[in-house]
Curated annotation (Swiss-Prot):
GO terms for molecular function: oxidoreductase activity. The gene is R2. It comes from Phoma sp. (strain ATCC 20986 / MF5453). InterPro entries: AsaB-like. NCBIfam families: CmcJ_NvfI_EfuI. It comes from the Eukaryota. This is Oxidoreductase R2.
Amino acid sequence: MATATTTLHSTTGTVYVADGTTDGKVGYYNHTDDSTNVIRKPIPIEVEDARTLSKSPTTKAEGYQLVNFHTKIPEEHFLNSKLPENKELIEEVYFDECRRLVQEVTGAAEAYPYVYRVRNQEQNAKESNKSNFHTDFVPIVHVDRDDVTAPQRLRASLGAEKADMLLSKYKSYGSINVWRPVKNMVQKWPLMLVDHKSIEDWDYSTHMFTLHSSNDERVATRGAKEHETILTHDKRYRYIYASDMTPEEAWLFFAFHSDPALGIPHGAFWDDSTKEEALTRCSIEVRIWVFFD
């Protein structure tokens, strides 16, 4: 596991989860006017520092792992990731770096990077309460896909024929995130992972809330997505983060896994110890389809 000097064992903060709807109907979000009937509930939490846990979590056992990771790509390419030449470099060189890292750590038989996101977070806690699910950072705890939407995205990413071949060939599969800070150590809105190992029957259908979208322009680039999948509260959850995370480290976690026990809800959280002068958090995540014998 990656290491760093820290005096923290845990911190406190706030995350947001789904708490039903205002009208008792199916949850919806309209991208045209930002309207929704979903109740977003703030939850005060204690967040354990992964650096001081007695046993380091692993992707194979817990579904998430903190690792050392160095890229040969200079940071300015990530900070200006929308430029065509930088996008090409990320998708060719950085994708391959992430693929090799993921296969080495997880033991995946095959791995296919398929998308990246660069996020910048400047808001404070009060401003975040006004934001929606599709801002440039995500304070709402979620998984990227579930057992309904993962096959949809897999086929959109790799093509239906190849996707179906891989699904029939391997015993299990998932979408793993390689999440890493860019430029600075994380001082604001660290990434938080939800450990639900203590809940034996945890499943996407029992502990996640489905949010149906309409008028989503991203369908053209990422394929259809029937719904977003947002966490509902359970007092048995453990919350994990890594203090003072640097660009030389990365979280690997399953944002979806065909075995729900390894699927990790996640999201940015407001750390109560955040200093007023804390720098903007910039991060990059790469999502990778992985397949296991």
